[in-house]
Amino acid sequence: MDGDIEHLLFIYALQNAVKHDSAPKSGTVIGTVLGKHPEFRSRARELGPLAGKAVAQVGKMSAADRKSRLEALAPELLAELTETHEHVRKLPDLEGAENGVVMRFAPNPSGPLHLGHARASILNDYYVRRYGGRYVLRVEDTDPKRVDPDAYAMVLEDVEWLGLGITDIVYQSDRLDIYYDWCRKLIELGGAYVCVCDSERFRELKLKGKACPCRELTVEENLELWQQMLDGEFYEGDVTVRVKTDLAHPDPAMRDYSAMRIVNAPLHPRVDATVFPLMNFSVAVDDHLLGITHVIRGKDHIANTRRQRYIFDYFGWKPPVYRHYGRMGISGVVLSTSGMREGINSGLYTGWDDIHLGTMRAIARRGIEPEAVRNAMVDIGIGETDISFSWENLYSRNKELVDPKANRYFFVPDPVEVTVEGAPRREAHAALHPNDPSRGVRTLVAEEAILLPRADIEGKSMVRLKDLYNVKIAWDGDTPRVSYAGDSLEEARHEKAPIIQWLPADAKLPCTLLRQDGSLEGFCEPLVAGETDRVVQFERIGFARIDSADGGRVSAYFAHR
């Protein structure tokens, strides 16, 4: 097992050195290995010395030696540098990152990850790989009302699918005693107090910039109330711990915000507790204790950054370097976790991977590769300007990846069965991939009846059947009469006859192509049944992932043109 890890560390150190034409960093190499081989995450802390050894070996090699050694040991990694990475945008430098970074991705386990999560997770991962260091997956599960027990596993699965180089996994619900301790310390500093005011009364005072009576309690009185909270002597809504801020702050939401509260129901799925921190308190404590150096997140968190700075200032902690990127509008899919859950429960959606949703598992089911998502998010970058997510760019990025791999097949939607009058028996030999003859060909035999796509022949007087011959079409109302019109491709071009796909009527499989705007029913080549869980190209239609081929029926999900 150690030999496997050492080999992986060495080849990825080589790849990093060739890519950047400089000596690699241990943290970057470790992040890459853990992102591509999550089975080693449980041993993340053991990798430092092994990575150091690999980096030292590579550092002594010349640029030419590095490249030739990489080509000998892992030619596919060298190919990645020329095929894909040369097209990936380089993001701006991070201040103070020269000696490595510690960054975090902090989802709430309310459901699976979606495109919004993907942006945050990928941008942070990008910089950890670039500068080296640690990448913490921090599951922020301190609000029982927003925790879905099934989401814990879904988040880990989605993180693995995205290939994030996670080095540490932290569950905030495991750290409640830590938050309790720091809350007590904050009270002792005079930076927080226990408030038993009615919430509406407190709101009225806050809007007027006035202190509530609880703000004047002594440290001893506050500590006694805090202990009563922990002992279960209060109930939900009775009490909260507030951080002392500026009652004259121009933004009322900044004035004495809540840090701790009681939640009696629902019960937390992982811990037996009723006192939980609110996000800004637990995040500030964790960012300090976990050594987070840089935080990249949306500008909708700018106010939270200001709240968290109060905690850092009270304790004299150095805050991370913050970068806030602009909002990303995403059209065409559902992203609201509550909306998705309601739709699933009502039967509107088939599950979290329904193609109308913006979850990672829905994206994956359509045949979008994780590297395409990564590249698309890096293309968007960390700018502060609000933008709209470009599906076309994601599809373009995915096409770069799947086009060289996807075998070609015919799919005939809404078929019309015809007999071509005067046609000879003919075998069509169509390449599985036009740029890779070694894959071989598909053989389609045209004799007697064939299937043609209705939409492609309606109103046409002549078409060319791809890899076969030309046919003329005469119409008797809605009924086509089809006759053989020779083999000449030049004649078809001269007549501007469209080239369409077709199938033998006696060699086909029923196929459903599921799309966001409605399904297509038709038939595909029998060989498609062997492509389950792979992306193929249905010629003239687009790329699709073959989801299943059970009971003689193919189910496919449309990816893009």
UniProtKB/Swiss-Prot annotation:
One cellular-component annotation, GO: protein-containing complex
Keywords: Aminoacyl-tRNA synthetase, ATP-binding, Cytoplasm, Ligase, Nucleotide-binding, Protein biosynthesis
Subcellular localization, as worded in the UniProt entry: Cytoplasm
InterPro entries documented for this protein: aa-tRNA-synth_I_CS, Gln/Glu-tRNA_Ligase, Glu-tRNA-synth_arc/euk, Glu/Gln-tRNA-synth, Glu/Gln-tRNA-synth_Ib_cat-dom, Glu/Gln-tRNA-synth_Ib_codon-bd, Rbsml_bL25/Gln-tRNA_synth_N, Ribosomal_bL25/Gln-tRNA_synth
Keyword Nucleotide-binding assigned: yes
Any one biological process term the GO annotation gives: glutamyl-tRNA aminoacylation
One Pfam family it belongs to: tRNA-synt_1c
The EC number(s) this enzyme carries: 6.1.1.17
Swiss-Prot/TrEMBL catalytic activity: tRNA(Glu) + L-glutamate + ATP = L-glutamyl-tRNA(Glu) + AMP + diphosphate
Placement of sequence motif 'HIGH' region: 107-117
PANTHER family: GLUTAMATE--TRNA LIGASE (PTHR43097:SF5), GLUTAMINE-TRNA LIGASE (PTHR43097)
Function (record text): Catalyzes the attachment of glutamate to tRNA(Glu) in a two-step reaction: glutamate is first activated by ATP to form Glu-AMP and then transferred to the acceptor end of tRNA(Glu).
Family: Belongs to the class-I aminoacyl-tRNA synthetase family. Glutamate--tRNA ligase type 2 subfamily.
Name of the molecule in the record: Glutamate--tRNA ligase
